[in-house]
Design a protein with these regions (language model features):
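Tandem repeat scaffolds
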Residues: 4-8, 18-226
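Active-site environment of non-heme Fe oxygenases that use a 2-His-1-carboxylate facial triad
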Residues: 13
Length: 226
């Protein structure tokens, strides 16, 4: 896709959001199946746009707003996502690799059968999100916030840095596999219903200065506490 074509689509989508032209419903941006690699989509309002199976490799989406968007099967490779805002978006079967999500916001989003690999996710917010069979491998997730999120089915945190994170009111952290991670300064000050359940093979895990209250560790083998 050329930059000129992209700008025309974005201009039409702005009319869709403003509802200021006749037949505005047909102006909605649908990028399904397109190659947006290397494109600049930063500082844009792309609410209600569709991005199924889109390639965002090397694209710039910094400080853009995506609400009620479909990212099914989307590919994010070396993508700039700093301070992006995702609200009620579907990331089923999507993949994030070597991408920057520093200070990004994800609220009420669905992450199913997808993966984050070698990403920078420091200070990222995942609030009221649903995770189902998600792999998080070799990521930097320091100072991230996972408040009020739900984990379904096995989710794996592998070889990642998880320092000083917030896990307030997480509902049922079930079937999580944590391997070769450093977990430091977890704070869970609320939620008497939070459950850390069935953590598998916690090799080389270090829990340092953790403040976890009202948690139940069921069928777990937690090692190397300091």
């Amino acid at each position: 896709m050329t930059e000129e074509t992209l700008n025309k689509i974005l201009e039409r989508h702005a009319h869709y959001l403003a509802q200021d032209v006749e037949d505005w419903e047909s102006y909605r941006a649908i990028f399904d199946g397109l190659d947006l690699s290397g494109m600049d989509l930063s500082f844009k309002n792309l609410q209600y746009a569709s991005f199924q199976n889109v390639d965002f490799s090397n694209a710039n989406l910094e400080v853009s707003a995506f609400r009620h968007c479909n990212f099914f099967g989307a590919k994010f490779f070396n993508t700039k996502l700093d301070s992006v805002h995702f609200d009620d978006c579907d990331f089923s079967f999507a993949s994030f690799r070597m991408s920057n999500l520093v200070s990004s916001w994800s609220e009420y989003c669905s992450f199913k059968h997808m993966r984050f690999e070698n990403c920078k996710m420091d200070r990222a917010l995942f609030s009221h999100c649903k995770f189902n069979r998600v792999l998080l491998s070799n990521n930097l997730m320091n100072f991230s916030n996972w408040s009020d999120s739900i984990f379904y089915e096995p989710c794996t945190f592998y070889n990642s840095s998880i320092l000083d994170i917030r896990m307030d009111c997480i509902k049922g952290i079930k079937n999580i596999e944590i391997k070769r991670c450093v977990v430091r300064d977890i704070e869970n000050p609320v939620s008497n219903r939070s459950i850390l359940y069935n953590i598998c093979r916690p090799e080389y895990i270090h829990y340092i200065c953790c403040r976890i209250k009202a948690f139940f560790f069921g069928q777990s083998s937690l090692e190397y506490w300091e």
